Every structure is written in structure tokens, then in C-alpha cells.
């Protein structure tokens, strides 16, 4: 959650944590899915991609290299799916640099 908060990304749902069957109807409202642990949620993310065309990021943001890769994948997803009317592209490279500079 902290990573998404730092990137100014609003979280739609955290499944299964605190989720209910009633909340499942909101899943397709997300621009993409983040699957931080492939053992939990990957099959659901694959289903949502197939059913709703919703991309997912499944790189675990643990360690310098994988955290940077995960953030870059998130950046690509957001920039691809952002409303075309905004013309604003996000650039998370400064955040990646800040998080990995002294490691």
C-alpha cells in the first residue's frame, strides 16, 4: 500500500484483505492489478485480464532490482491506460532513484 500511496495511485480494492463478495463488482473499475505475491492472486489477475482486458503487474517489489522493475511496469500501465484527454504521463524514475540511490 505504501508504494502505491507514494506513487499517488488510489487503491480500488485489496483482495482478499477486507474484501467481500459485494465488493467484487468494483474490481473491473481498476486500471490495472498489482499482484505483489504470485502465489496469491495471479490466477485472478489473469482472469481479469482475459475477461476485462485489465493488465496486471506481477513483479514482487522486493529488493532494489525488482522494486525498480515493478514500478516501471506500473508506470507503463498507468501511461497506457490514462485518459487520452489528459496528455499527462507519469514519470516514476525520480522515485526509483530516491529509493535505490543509497543501497
Swiss-Prot record:
Pathway where this protein functions: Porphyrin-containing compound metabolism; chlorophyll biosynthesis (light-independent)
Leading EC class: oxidoreductase
UniProt xrefs under Pfam families: Oxidored_nitro
Catalytic activity line of the entry: chlorophyllide a + oxidized 2[4Fe-4S]-[ferredoxin] + 2 ADP + 2 phosphate = protochlorophyllide a + reduced 2[4Fe-4S]-[ferredoxin] + 2 ATP + 2 H2O
Broad class of the protein's primary localization: plastid
GO biological process: light-independent chlorophyll biosynthetic process; photosynthesis
Annotated localization: Plastid, Chloroplast
UniProt GO MF annotations: 4 iron, 4 sulfur cluster binding; ATP binding; metal ion binding; oxidoreductase activity
Cofactor: [4Fe-4S] cluster
Gene3D superfamilies, alphabetized: Nitrogenase molybdenum iron protein domain
UniProt-listed Enzyme Commission number(s): 1.3.7.7
Co-factor: note: Binds 1 [4Fe-4S] cluster per heterodimer. The cluster is bound at the heterodimer interface by residues from both subunits.
Gene Ontology CC terms: chloroplast
Keywords of this entry: 4Fe-4S, ATP-binding, Chlorophyll biosynthesis, Chloroplast, Iron, Iron-sulfur, Metal-binding, Nucleotide-binding, Oxidoreductase, Photosynthesis, Plastid
Family statement: Belongs to the ChlB/BchB/BchZ family.
Function text: Component of the dark-operative protochlorophyllide reductase (DPOR) that uses Mg-ATP and reduced ferredoxin to reduce ring D of protochlorophyllide (Pchlide) to form chlorophyllide a (Chlide). This reaction is light-independent. The NB-protein (ChlN-ChlB) is the catalytic component of the complex.
Assembly and oligomerization: Protochlorophyllide reductase is composed of three subunits; ChlL, ChlN and ChlB. Forms a heterotetramer of two ChlB and two ChlN subunits.
Protein name as it appears in the record: Light-independent protochlorophyllide reductase subunit B
Amino acid at each position: 500500500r505504501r508504494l502505491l500511496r507514494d506513487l499517488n495511485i488510489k487503491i480500488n480494492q485489496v483482495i482478499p484483505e477486507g474484501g467481500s463478495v459485494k465488493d467484487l463488482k468494483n474490481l473491473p473499475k481498476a486500471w490495472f492489478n498489482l499482484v505483489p505475491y504470485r502465489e496469491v492472486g495471479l490466477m485472478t489477475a489473469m482472469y481479469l485480464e482475459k475477461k476485462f482486458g485489465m493488465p496486471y503487474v506481477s513483479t514482487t517489489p522486493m529488493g532494489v532490482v525488482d522494486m525498480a522493475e515493478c514500478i516501471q511496469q506500473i508506470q507503463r500501465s498507468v501511461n497506457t491506460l490514462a485518459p487520452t484527454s489528459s496528455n499527462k504521463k507519469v514519470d516514476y524514475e525520480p522515485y526509483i532513484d530516491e529509493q535505490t540511490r543509497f543501497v
